[in-house]
C-alpha cells in the first residue's frame, strides 16, 4: 500500500477499502 496515499491530500489511504479515509487498517 505504498505510494497510493500520495493522491489522498487531507485524508490518508486506507488499505482495507482501497480509498481515501481518515484512518488506517
Curated annotation (Swiss-Prot):
State where it is primarily located.
secreted
- Cystine links in this protein are 1-16, 8-20, 15-25
Spell out where the chain crosses the membrane. Answer: none
List the subcellular locations. Secreted
Q: Which UniProt keywords apply?
A: Amidation, Calcium channel impairing toxin, Disulfide bond, Ion channel impairing toxin, Knottin, Secreted, Toxin, Voltage-gated calcium channel impairing toxin
- GO molecular function ontology, one term from the record: ion channel inhibitor activity
Residues bearing Cysteine amide are 25
Which body tissues produce this protein?
A: Expressed by the venom duct.
Free-text comment on this protein's domains from its UniProt entry: The presence of a 'disulfide through disulfide knot' structurally defines this protein as a knottin.
Question: Can you name this protein?
Answer: Omega conotoxin-CVIF
Q: Which organism is it from?
A: Conus catus (Cat cone)
Amino acid at each position: 500500500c505504498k505510494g497510493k496515499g500520495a493522491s489522498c491530500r487531507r485524508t490518508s489511504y486506507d488499505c482495507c477499502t482501497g480509498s481515501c479515509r481518515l484512518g488506517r487498517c
